C-alpha cells in the first residue's frame, strides 16, 4: 500500500501543462498497472500532498524503479539498469523531444513522418541509460548510433541492448575518442544521418552543478541537513552534467563542428536548457550559413524546455534527400 509522504512536496505531481499529443504519458500515471508489471516499484510508492500515488523523486532508487516500470509497460524494454550515480532521466520529457523531432521531420516531408530503419539518428551523449535510442526505435522504428566519451556509460548501454535483442540490431554504440570534439572523429565521411539529438552538459564545473542543486532543493523545501540528497534528482556523472564553459561553450562547439558535416545531416538538433543561450547560438548558426534555424518549445509539467534545430541543406538538396531516404514514410497518425 502507498505510504503517506511528508508535508513537503517530496513527490512531483503531473501538471496540466501538456505533453506532446503522441506522448504515452499524458494524464496520471497508472501505478497499479506499473506495479503489476514491476512489483519492486511498490515499496517506493507514496501518497503525495494531493492525495495521489507517486514516488519521491529525490530518491534515486525510486526513480530508477519507476523508469524501469515505465520502460517495460510502454516501450517493451524488458531489462534496464544503470550504474549508481549515472543520469536517470525523466522518461516523459525524453519522449517529448523525440515526438517533436518526428514532427519536424514530418513538416519537412509534406506532413508525413518518415519512419522505419531507413532513417538514422545520431544521439550525442547517449549515456549509460541509452534512453533516446530505445524510445526512438520503439516509437518510430529509426536506427540509432549512440555516442559517448565515457567507457562505463557505453558498457552500461551495451548491457541494456544485450538484454533487449529486439533493439540491439537497430542501435549501434560508438565511443568519441576525443572529448574536445563532438562530431569530428565520430562521424565517418561517407555516412549520413537524418537527425542528430543531444542533451548537453548544463554546468561549467562540478562545483557549479553542486551549488545549483542545493538551490533547487532549498527552493523545494528539501534542503534538510539530516538528509543526504543526490547531486541532482536524476543523478549524473561528470560528462553528463558539466563541461568547460558550460552549456554555452558546448553549443558553440557543436554548431562550429556541424558545418563540416553540412551535407551529411538533414537536421542537427540539441536541447537548450538556458533560454539565455539561444540568441548566441542562433547568431552563430546564421554566421555559419545554416539555411533554416528553428526553436521548438516543449513543456513537461511545470518545466519549460526547448530544442534548436538547424540544417545547411538548400531546398534542392532537401528534395533529393527525401526522395532517396524517406520514400517509405508512413502518414501522420498511423
Curated annotation (Swiss-Prot):
Keywords on record: Cytoplasm, Methyltransferase, rRNA processing, S-adenosyl-L-methionine, Transferase
EC number: 2.1.1.181
A Pfam cross-reference name: Methyltransf_10
Keyword rRNA processing part of the UniProt annotation: yes
GO biological process: rRNA base methylation
Regions annotated as coiled coil: none
This protein's record includes keyword S-adenosyl-L-methionine: yes
HAMAP family for this protein: 23SrRNA_methyltr_F
Record-stated family: Belongs to the methyltransferase superfamily. METTL16/RlmF family.
Function (record text): Specifically methylates the adenine in position 1618 of 23S rRNA.
Protein name per the record: Ribosomal RNA large subunit methyltransferase F
Source organism of the structure: Pseudomonas paraeruginosa (strain DSM 24068 / PA7) (Pseudomonas aeruginosa (strain PA7))
Gene name linked to the record: rlmF
Amino acid at each position: 500500500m502507498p505510504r503517506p509522504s511528508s508535508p513537503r512536496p517530496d513527490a512531483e505531481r503531473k501538471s496540466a501543462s501538456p505533453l506532446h499529443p503522441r506522448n504515452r504519458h499524458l494524464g496520471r500515471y497508472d501505478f497499479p498497472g506499473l506495479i503489476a508489471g514491476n512489483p519492486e516499484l511498490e515499496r517506493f510508492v507514496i501518497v503525495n500532498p494531493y492525495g495521489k500515488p507517486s514516488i519521491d523523486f529525490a530518491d534515486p532508487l525510486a526513480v530508477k524503479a519507476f523508469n524501469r516500470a515505465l520502460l517495460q509497460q510502454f516501450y517493451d524494454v524488458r531489462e534496464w539498469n544503470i550504474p549508481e550515480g549515472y543520469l536517470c532521466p525523466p522518461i516523459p520529457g525524453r519522449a517529448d523531444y523525440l515526438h517533436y523531432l518526428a514532427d519536424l521531420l514530418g513538416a519537412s516531408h509534406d506532413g508525413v513522418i518518415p519512419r522505419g530503419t531507413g532513417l538514422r539518428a545520431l544521439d550525442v551523449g547517449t549515456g549509460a541509460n541509452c534512453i533516446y535510442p530505445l524510445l526512438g526505435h520503439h516509437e518510430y522504428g529509426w536506427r540509432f548510433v549512440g555516442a559517448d566519451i565515457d567507457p562505463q556509460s557505453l558498457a552500461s548501454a551495451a548491457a541494456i541492448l544485450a538484454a533487449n535483442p529486439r533493439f540491439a540490431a537497430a542501435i549501434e554504440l560508438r565511443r568519441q575518442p576525443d572529448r574536445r570534439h563532438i562530431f569530428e572523429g565520430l562521424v565517418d565521411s561517407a555516412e549520413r544521418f537524418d537527425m542528430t539529438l543531444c542533451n548537453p552538459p548544463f554546468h561549467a564545473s562540478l562545483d557549479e552543478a553542486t551549488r545549483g542543486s542545493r538551490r533547487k532543493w532549498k527552493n523545494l523545501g528539501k534542503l534538510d541537513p539530516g538528509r543526504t540528497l543526490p547531486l541532482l534528482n536524476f543523478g549524473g556523472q561528470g560528462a553528463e552534467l558539466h563541461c568547460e564553459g558550460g552549456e554555452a561553450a558546448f553549443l558553440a562547439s557543436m554548431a562550429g563542428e556541424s558545418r563540416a558535416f553540412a551535407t551529411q545531416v538533414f537536421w542537427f538538433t540539441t536541447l537548450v536548457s538556458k533560454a539565455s543561450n539561444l540568441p548566441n547560438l542562433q547568431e552563430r548558426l546564421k554566421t555559419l550559413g545554416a539555411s533554416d534555424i528553428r526553436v521548438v518549445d516543449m513543456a513537461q509539467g511545470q518545466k519549460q524546455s526547448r530544442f534548436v534545430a538547424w540544417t545547411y541543406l538548400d531546398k534542392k538538396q532537401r528534395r533529393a534527400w527525401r526522395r532517396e531516404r524517406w520514400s517509405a514514410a508512413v502518414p501522420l497518425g498511423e
